[in-house]
Amino acid sequence: MKTITLRPGQMTLADLRHIYQHPVHITLDESAYVPIQQSVDCVQAILAEQRTAYGINTGFGLLASTRIATEDLENLQRSIVLSHAAGVGEANDDAIVRLIMVLKINSLARGFSGIRLEVIQALITLVNAGVYPHIPLKGSVGASGDLAPLAHMSLLLLGEGKARYQGEWLPAHTALAQAGLQPLTLAAKEGLALLNGTQVSAAYALRGLFEAEDLYAAASVFGCLTVDAALGSRSPFDARIHAVRGQRGQIDAASTYRHLLGERSEISESHKNCDKVQDPYSLRCQPQVMGACLGQIRQAAEVLAIESNAVSDNPLVFAEQGDVLSGGNFHAEPVAMAADNLALALAEIGSLSECRISLMMDKHMSQLPPFLVENGGVNSGFMIAQVTAAALTSENKGLAFPASVDSIPTSANQEDHVSMAPRAGKRLWEMAENVRNILAIEWLAACQGLDLRKGLRTSAILEPARQLLRQHVTYYDKDRFFAPDIEVASQLIAQRHMNELMPAKLLPSL
């Protein structure tokens, strides 16, 4: 298990990818201790001076004008957690919950939330012990923060709710005991600090980012396999073409295709003197389309890297000046728009792949047997697999509709504009699964097409991708039950083998 020393505000996308994909041991850098304590001292000074400060000694939302008596402050913090834990739906899996918790720890430890080190360390202890609170998938509109899901996370600290440990749901007290913890009593401001923030929205979008990166890598590899299977030209990837346009993503995508295809292969040599002038767009324009997708992925990654290190609590404690300021950092609009950008990229990655699959079905376009099978008529080959890819592609078109343009008033119109960032991020998972299956079909089709080229080899970099599939799925000499092969190929893609074939530093978190 990897140990990560958390320096608040300095987590990288590579760190976050690892935290999402693997259990980790977190330690908090000691440089965080002083700012954390100073923010707590500031809250205590406000209480001692009997100043009124939102979230410290007032109600919440539309009830912000209600002053809370000092003797009720602890009960106020407990009440907000209990009342706000109103999420519904299936539970988030351990990987997402772990990522949510670490993002919350990172934000709180910046020292602008007025929450004690003891509470932050309790969250760290839970992560390190592999005790993951029950957090339902649904219930947040992404402003004022992700209140309901973060309340479910916080229930466990109070000894309420339940948590999963080694795959088993346990009552809160039992789960806390597994981590060596006792229930906490929250002090002034701490309940609100735990609940307010964009960490669930960010975690949902980060998962979408990581999956988009993995699928970008796979689509680049399989797109090159299809170029060779369809006897496509390498000239559209010439660096000069892309340099004169100047789009950074396109330039890098074209460089990736040159890297994968190599200067020559047995297949490219077999048709270098053919009379074909231009390839269809789905082969020829891959750098332009995939480069645009790469640009969207990178832009989203930049936003999510910032948000993952942000303080998105409200109010914020500025201890140096002794101020507590109310603002709107909990509004997850940047996350929602980043997720919408990722949705566009995923939809286009899948759409372009489906076009290449369709090309290979057509003997006039691919110069391969119809539907990639010999003895057509008796055999239908890839006919309906292509239809499945088409269905998934069209499904993603609907899912790609921007979530950030939606809003609905909440909290008696006090919170009258919301981001819908959780929905924006969560639908990326469904889109990614669709794209993974589309790419699985292309991988199967491209390798079938290559095998139909009399065993000619593709480039040295691409051959391992071809051989990996053939270790698990054999050549189609006749029709057979197709769905299991799609599932096998999809699972291999999910194992991220294609990332290893990508040039270094192409994708933000890799």
Curated annotation (Swiss-Prot):
Family annotation (CDD domains): PAL-HAL
A GO term for molecular function: histidine ammonia-lyase activity
Modifications after synthesis and translation: Contains an active site 4-methylidene-imidazol-5-one (MIO), which is formed autocatalytically by cyclization and dehydration of residues Ala-Ser-Gly.
Keyword Lyase attributed: yes
Keywords of this entry: Cytoplasm, Histidine metabolism, Lyase
Any one GO BP annotation for this protein: L-histidine catabolic process to glutamate and formate
Record PTM 2,3-didehydroalanine (Ser), positions in chain: 144
Cross-link (5-imidazolinone (Ala-Gly)): 143-145
Any one of the GO CC terms: cytoplasm
InterPro entries: Aromatic_Lyase (IPR001106), Fumarase/histidase_N (IPR024083), HutH (IPR005921), L-Aspartase-like (IPR008948), Phe/His_NH3-lyase_AS (IPR022313)
Enzymatic reactions: L-histidine = trans-urocanate + NH4(+)
Gene3D superfamilies, per database record: Fumarase/aspartase (Central domain), Fumarase/aspartase (N-terminal domain)
Subcellular location: Cytoplasm
Entry keyword Lyase: yes
Enzyme Commission number(s) of this protein: 4.3.1.3
Entry-linked Pfam families: Lyase_aromatic
Pathway as given in its UniProt record: Amino-acid degradation; L-histidine degradation into L-glutamate; N-formimidoyl-L-glutamate from L-histidine: step 1/3
Cross-referenced PANTHER family: HISTIDINE AMMONIA-LYASE
Recorded family membership: Belongs to the PAL/histidase family.
Protein name: Histidine ammonia-lyase
Organism placement in taxonomy: Bacteria, Pseudomonadati, Pseudomonadota, Gammaproteobacteria, Enterobacterales
